[in-house]
Amino acid sequence: MRLITHNMLSCNIKGVTSGFPLRIEAGNVIEKEVDFNPDFIRHMFAKIEWKALVEGARSMGYAELPEESPDAAVLKSDEPFLKKLHHALLELHLEEGALVCPETGRKFPVNKGIPNMLLHEDEV
């Protein structure tokens, strides 16, 4: 599971009001090279919840992103930053581990890079 995916997932258990961001418990993290496309990264930046991305990246062992979200000027001119963001969003893969609901503590397993977000009958 890539961090770009993680940034769009939330806990949908009935009654949960603060199910985002899911905390990552990383078991196995791998890196898979992906072609760098700066225009795609710039486009996706507006859709990303920055704090969740930084926390997710750090939980997967990647600490190259700044705490504070950069401004638009950085996105236009700072290619090294865009490459770091690209790496975090697209090249880091959580192969094994879990996503944990911040409100309930419910763990959603991640196996072979696929998060299992299915709810139990009593959670629907």
UniProtKB/Swiss-Prot annotation:
InterPro entries: Trm112, Trm112-like. Acts as an activator of both rRNA/tRNA and protein methyltransferases. Required for TRM9 tRNA methyltransferase activity. Involved in the regulation of cell division progression during organ growth. Required for the expression of cell cycle-related genes, and the G2-M phase progression during organogenesis. Interacts with TRM9. Belongs to the TRM112 family. This is Multifunctional methyltransferase subunit TRM112 homolog A. GO terms for molecular function: protein heterodimerization activity. Residues 2-120 form the TRM112 domain. The lineage of its organism: Eukaryota, Viridiplantae, Streptophyta, Embryophyta, Tracheophyta. One of its GO terms (biological process) is organ growth. It comes from Arabidopsis thaliana (Mouse-ear cress). It holds the Pfam family Trm112p. Disruption phenotype: Semi-dwarf phenotype. Reduced organ growth due to inhibition of cell proliferation.
